[in-house]
Curated annotation (Swiss-Prot):
It comes from Salmonella typhimurium (strain LT2 / SGSC1412 / ATCC 700720). It holds the Pfam family Hydrolase_3. This is 3-deoxy-D-manno-octulosonate 8-phosphate phosphatase KdsC. Its cofactor is Mg(2+). Homotetramer. Substrate binds at residues 34, 55-59, 63, 78, 86, 102. Belongs to the KdsC family. Pathway: Carbohydrate biosynthesis; 3-deoxy-D-manno-octulosonate biosynthesis; 3-deoxy-D-manno-octulosonate from D-ribulose 5-phosphate: step 3/3; Bacterial outer membrane biogenesis; lipopolysaccharide biosynthesis. Its EC number is 3.1.3.45. It comes from the Bacteria. Keywords: Hydrolase, Lipopolysaccharide biosynthesis, Magnesium, Metal-binding. The keyword Metal-binding applies. Catalyzes the hydrolysis of 3-deoxy-D-manno-octulosonate 8-phosphate (KDO 8-P) to 3-deoxy-D-manno-octulosonate (KDO) and inorganic phosphate.
Length: 188
């Protein structure tokens, strides 16, 4: 790829060399929940129970990332037991819920994991995510993110939140790091 501005064709769509270079160095992937791991809809039952749908392809991608030595963390503005349960199922141990200021959790993660901001990717869908996204090495907005977030992100997924966008990002990181063919996940 010697032409300036040329893109790498992936199974999801084109990816710029600039994004691939940033993705090579990612050691921590931080995800929002509503609108990223889920489609952003919240179903409320008659007894106050909250339901969300999670995509198993995203789960497989997360497991592949974790088994390929990429840490995965969740920072979300809401608090829900089902998110805690989903994280436990996937093996995500870094969970921050009820975060109105996501920078506090971000700083805690950097210190706890001894990771520099340039080695972090963050996937978000709304303006609450931008303060962290502007500090990381690779900022990602899902395809159906808030219109003001999309032009600010380093990469915009080709797939919407809750529909496999996280799997797309996991595959991108693994491809950039030469680990995609050996990655092992689990359909959960």
């Amino acid at each position: 790829m010697s032409k300036a501005g040329a893109s790498l064709a992936t199974c999801y769509g084109p990816v710029s060399p600039h994004v691939m270079t940033k993705a090579e160095n990612i050691r921590l992937l931080i995800l929002d929940v509503d609108g990223v791991l889920s489609d952003g809809l919240i179903y409320m039952g008659n007894n106050g129970e909250e339901l969300k749908a999670f995509n198993v392809r995203d789960g497989y991608g997360i497991r592949c990332a974790l088994t390929s030595n990429i840490e995965v963390a969740i920072i979300t503005g809401r608090k829900a037991k089902l998110v805690e349960d989903r994280c436990a199922t996937l093996g995500i141990v870094h969970l921050y819920q009820g975060q109105s200021n996501k920078l506090i959790a971000f700083s805690d993660l950097l210190e706890k994991l001894a990771i520099a901001p340039e080695n972090v990717a963050y996937v978000g869908d709304d303006l609450i995510d931008w303060p962290v996204m502007e500090k990381v090495g690779l900022s990602v907005a899902v395809a159906d993110a808030h219109p003001l977030l999309i032009p600010r992100a380093d990469y915009v997924t080709h797939i919407a939140g809750g529909r496999g966008a996280v799997r797309e990002v996991c595959d991108l990181l693994l491809l950039a790091q030469g680990k995609l063919d050996e990655a092992k996940g689990q359909s959960i």
